[in-house]
């Protein structure tokens, strides 16, 4: 089971979201409660527009978060790196390759999720499995993602993807393509 990282009691939220050390403390605490993965998204600030090149400071901050969290949890938990579909293809590749030494379990929507060509390019260039699907709605969309090799971890949102019955169909397609499911609830 995974959890997002949140400030612990006594931590100031404004400081937490920019502090690798505080996030590492939160991650260690989550692991002590039995979580086996922690999700975080330090590459912001995020905007309503996607497809931009992350600044070197965004990459450096993201690497610092991954390093601190990995050191805090060791091999007791996986790292789940979210991006909210914010990067250009080149930017997503640049960011993903910088994160590879920390072995995240997934790289969530590194480019806008409706840009299948770009997501496929990122999946081929980065050694972190791409996760996607919270904004996809139909099994046809998930089928296209799988056929293109754009993501190895599907994240359909139960309500958006048509409920339990459709989610089971998406899971069957994922199994055929040797992909994993991590529903976005």
Model-derived segments and spans:
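A cross-family glycoside hydrolase active-site/sugar-binding cleft signature
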Residues: 2-4, 39-41, 80-84, 108-110, ...
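Conserved, mostly hydrophobic/aromatic
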Residues: 38, 69, 82, 107, ...
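N-terminal capping/lid subdomain adjacent to the active-site entrance of alpha/beta enzymes
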Residues: 1-80, 86, 90-93, 97-101
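Generic preference for well-ordered secondary structure
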Residues: 22, 53, 79, 106, ...
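Shared catalytic-loop signature of beta/alpha-barrel
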Residues: 97, 103, 114-185
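Short, well-ordered helical secondary-structure segments
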Residues: 22, 66, 74, 109, ...
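Right-handed parallel beta-helix/beta-solenoid
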Residues: 88, 111-112
